[in-house]
Amino acid sequence: YMSTTIVCCNTRKYHGLMVCPIGDGEQNYVLLSNLDETVIQHDQSFNLAIRRFPGIYEPRGHKYITDFAYTPTPTITYRVGGVVLRKEMLWIHRRTQLLIRYTLLDAHSPTRLRLRPFLAFRNMHELSHANMFADGRTYAAAGGVRCRLYEDFPWLYMQTNRDAEFVAAPDWYYNFEYAEEARRGYPFREDLLTPG
């Protein structure tokens, strides 16, 4: 399944864009926690994401949201200056597949979109922490790349239907906070790895 908030800021440890059973299917695992989208125009970057870190929300891309619709598929429309971008998310249950379609509705000059996935590869009841065992490497796949942080997990494929350049730059981001977990008195800080 896919589960997050309307502004795509995870507040629970079981939130994620790719949460699925592995092995015997009794437990769900968060593979893809979230995805940062950045609109680039005139060499300026506008990150559409919002994340909570200790004492701060950063980036604050929620301010660019102009519309949200839940049906027929979750759809968010962003406006950044002269750029209007629509994001539609469709979960294909039987295939354990998430499709995200970006449509550039309006732009007055050349515009690029940069995507940065944040990976957890963990049981949905646990939290991920930076470690030296995670494999941040990516491998070429048709239309994109595949990665797997730990050997016992399935490959996660990230593919596009357009020509795209993947820049490998594996790195840990520290102390993502999940507000609802904190409110309930549970552990609420997590580190996530981005492959690039």
Annotate each language-model stretch with its function:
Residues 1-196:
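Terminal accessory carbohydrate-recognition/targeting modules of carbohydrate-active enzymes
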